[in-house]
């Protein structure tokens, strides 16, 4: 029997850089330029080779001082995963791009796309294989007949829509939908390639200013559907 697994980045703190999941939310912030970076290391005490995730992104508004109806948003993103003893690694470079229409009384609607390139690799020579078993253990000096390096590179495309409303009292509301891997790029190596599941994301959040109690209530919701997998994250913060 042959089993298949897929690797794809997931961010639970999407509100820190929403364009990582929805290209339509690129450059919808109040600032003209933003920068985001994230580093995560997992299973430090359990595994000799830790699971590591890196993310870097930057966004900029274009034409907001010249266009009457809104502005263009442009971003650049880089994601990197390094996993386990086999050194399975992925590099993802994406360029989200959108247009934001400014509506009545600080309401905004945008459509965006995100083309990208995915590169994946693993080192087969540092693993153990069935023909290296000598009856007692695995002998790494025996040639495994496996390729010393496996790599693949594919294009991926995402798209989304986004709406945001700002209120005079400082409250706000936003909602969005996006779809990633629309072209279902291949994963796997050599003859064991298979298509990546398309990812569908719905997200909404808000900030409710309570002057009476002098704090801000910010509920958040995101749902992610990808093949047989479902993720639902609900939370809120108080400021």
Which residues does each PLM region occupy?
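C-terminal segment of classical bacterial N-terminal signal peptides
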Residues: 1-4
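Subset of outer-membrane beta-barrel
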Residues: 6-239
């Amino acid at each position: 029997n042959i089993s298949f697994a897929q690797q794809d980045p997931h961010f639970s703190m999407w509100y820190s850089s929403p364009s990582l999941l929805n290209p339509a939310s690129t450059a919808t912030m109040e600032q003209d330029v933003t920068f985001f970076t994230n580093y995560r290391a997992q299973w430090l005490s359990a595994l000799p080779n830790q699971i590591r995730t890196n993310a870097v992104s930057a966004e900029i508004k274009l034409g907001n001082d010249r266009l009457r109806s809104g502005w263009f948003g442009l971003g650049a993103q880089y994601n990197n995963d390094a996993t386990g003893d086999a050194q399975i690694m992925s590099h993802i470079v994406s360029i989200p791009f959108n247009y934001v229409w400014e509506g009545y009384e600080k309401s905004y609607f945008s459509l965006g796309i995100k083309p990208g390139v995915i590169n994946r690799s693993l080192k087969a020579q540092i693993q153990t294989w069935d023909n290296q078993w000598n009856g007692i253990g695995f002998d790494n000096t025996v040639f495994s007949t496996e390729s010393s390096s496996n790599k693949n590179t594919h294009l991926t495309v995402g798209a989304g829509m986004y709406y945001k409303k700002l209120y005079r009292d400082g409250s706000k509301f936003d909602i969005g939908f996006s779809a990633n891997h629309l072209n279902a790029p291949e994963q796997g190596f050599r003859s064991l390639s298979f298509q990546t599941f398309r990812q569908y994301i719905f997200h909404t959040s808000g900030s409710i200013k309570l002057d009476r109690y002098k704090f801000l209530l910010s509920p958040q919701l995101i749902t992610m559907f990808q093949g047989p997998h479902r993720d639902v994250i609900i939370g809120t913060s108080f400021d």
